Amino acid sequence: MNQEEHVKLLGLWGSPFSKRVEMVLKLKGIPYEYIEEDVYGNRSPMLLKYNPIHKKVPVLIHNGRSIAESLVIVEYIEDTWKTTHTILPQDPYERAMARFWAKYVDEKVMLAVKKACWGPESEREKEVKEAYEGLKCLEKELGDKLFFGGETIGFVDIAADFIGYWLGIFQEASGVTIMTAEEFPKLQRWSEDFVGNNFIKEVLPPKEKLVAVLKAMFGSVTSN
């Protein structure tokens, strides 16, 4: 890879947001340099330089220019490297729908899951119900498709990486049950197919390490 195509990714090993970017880079076969950031301690001068507003990961650096926010980065990669593994449909309506569901995952489902697992106990029942209802909408949207993107992994699948891998880890670490195979058979099957993809599997963080870190940071409901 020549210098003008040099790609760097500033990320965090256990972050589903960072992993979204890595997944797309792997799926498209784009070589990149990965740089681990300590976002909970001393943020590096590079992170402060390339994302001075939010000071968060992930940050993609391409040709010396930086892009922040995981789904923005994913779209940038799609627009820049169009020849391999297309993740957004060409039809404008279908692209808009993909963006809608990706935003739904972030703003509805993921937020509710986090609150259900580690939010105030007084609000847990409400948040579990909200997360459950959000997952039911995704179950319906997935239907009988192999992936949200159809026959191959697409934009919504990448956005939903949290559901495919991290949700089970959150449930194990917190002791809160939201999604079961019996109630969400389509999402369960999708999760297995998604994390079973060789390119996806390659970048997933160790489950045991994530569970231990989450328990240390937040504790579990069953231990309270």
Curated annotation (Swiss-Prot):
Compartments (UniProt record): Cytoplasm, Cytosol
Classification via Pfam families: GST_C, GST_N
Keywords from the named record: Cytoplasm, Detoxification, Phosphoprotein, Transferase
Organism, as annotated: Arabidopsis thaliana (Mouse-ear cress)
Function according to Swiss-Prot or TrEMBL: May be involved in the conjugation of reduced glutathione to a wide number of exogenous and endogenous hydrophobic electrophiles and have a detoxification role against certain herbicides.
UniProt-recorded Gene Ontology molecular function terms: glutathione transferase activity
PROSITE patterns xrefs: GST_CTER, GST_NTER
Name of this chain's protein: Glutathione S-transferase U8
GO CC annotations, alphabetized: cytoplasm; cytosol
Keyword DNA-binding: no
InterPro entries in alphabetical order: Glutathione-S-Trfase_C-like, Glutathione-S-Trfase_C_sf, Glutathione_S-Trfase_N, GST_C, GST_C_Tau, Omega/Tau-like, Thioredoxin-like_sf
Binding locations of glutathione: 15-16, 42-43, 56-57, 69-70
Catalysed transformations (reactions): RX + glutathione = an S-substituted glutathione + a halide anion + H(+)
Domain GST N-terminal: 5-85
Residues in GST C-terminal domain copies: 91-213
Assigned protein family: Belongs to the GST superfamily. Tau family.
EC number: 2.5.1.18
Claim: Metal-binding is one of the keywords in the record: no
GO biological process, one term: toxin catabolic process
Membrane-spanning residues: none
Residues with PTM Phosphothreonine: 152
Gene that specifies this protein: GSTU8
